[in-house]
């Protein structure tokens, strides 16, 4: 009987250890090519592959948790998951409430409207309706730079909903990550009549230092492990292999 109880205790301990090895990773699967789903519902994309590479380095298993973008940080604080790997910009505002890893990519944002739209500055879009992802840095930029010029800013729970409403004529355009809007809209048939206007947007006042992995404050050991993992995959070729699946340039940035 004692041996049986000991065996059960060991099994429970092993199960507990296996559970502890899982790293719950929040993603918004509506953000192609960074986080989206295959036809069978499997999470995929640049962010997903980076998360799996990091998990491999720190010897933990990634378990992906789908989350609406605007609830990402509240969900992290509520311990619904351990980290956010979903194109989360490292900004001063966010650093006040959560911690970040070192950056793992940095790409510009851009305005997308119908081709032929004359643009010399925000005032050129006066009277137009521009859709943005709710809670995003692009929303911050649009509210700070476009709204004062008379542009109506319409926040959405998911970026793919923005594209649907552009095609339906309910929106005139969007402000989005330049790579995401290319992969998720412009390169598709429904985006063929639209294009970029204005300069690429890098303003750190809105967009911060690049994209990092978000985690709760005080997780010093996890942060150190993840930062080392990012350094390792950058140096051993894993990062480049992942990047080449999705891009024809180095998304790490300058």
Q: Could you describe each region identified by the protein language model?
A:
Residues 21-254:
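Proline/Glycine/Serine-rich low-complexity intrinsically disordered segments
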Residues 7-15:
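Bacterial N-terminal signal peptides
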Residues 1, 14-22:
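Sec/Tat signal peptide C-region and signal peptidase I cleavage site
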Residues 1-7:
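Bacterial N-terminal signal peptides that target proteins for export
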């Amino acid at each position: 009987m004692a041996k049986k109880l000991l065996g059960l205790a060991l099994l429970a301990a092993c199960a507990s250890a296996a559970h502890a090895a899982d790293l719950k990773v929040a993603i918004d699967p509506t953000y192609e090519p960074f986080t989206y789903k295959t036809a069978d519902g499997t999470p995929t994309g640049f962010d997903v592959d980076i998360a799996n590479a990091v998990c491999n380095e720190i010897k933990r298993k990634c378990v992906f948790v789908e989350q609406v973008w605007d609830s990402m940080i509240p969900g992290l604080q509520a311990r619904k998951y351990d980290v956010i790997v979903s194109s989360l910009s490292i900004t001063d505002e966010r650093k006040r409430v959560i911690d970040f890893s070192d950056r793992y990519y940095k790409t510009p944002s851009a305005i997308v409207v119908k081709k032929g739209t004359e643009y010399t500055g925000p005032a050129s879009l006066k009277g137009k309706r521009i859709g943005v992802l709710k809670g995003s840095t692009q929303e911050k930029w649009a509210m700070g730079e476009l709204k004062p010029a008379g542009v109506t800013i319409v926040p959405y729970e998911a970026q793919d909903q923005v594209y649907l409403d552009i095609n339906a004529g309910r929106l005139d355009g969007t402000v989005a990550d330049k790579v995401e809007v290319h992969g998720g809209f412009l390169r598709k048939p429904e985006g063929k009549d639209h294009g970029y206007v204005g300069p690429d947007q890098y303003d750190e006042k809105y967009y911060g230092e690049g994209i990092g992995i978000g985690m709760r404050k005080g997780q010093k050991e996890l942060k150190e492990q993840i930062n080392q993992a990012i350094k390792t995959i950058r140096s051993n070729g894993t990062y480049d292999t992942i990047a080449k699946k999705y891009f024809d340039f180095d998304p790490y940035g300058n």
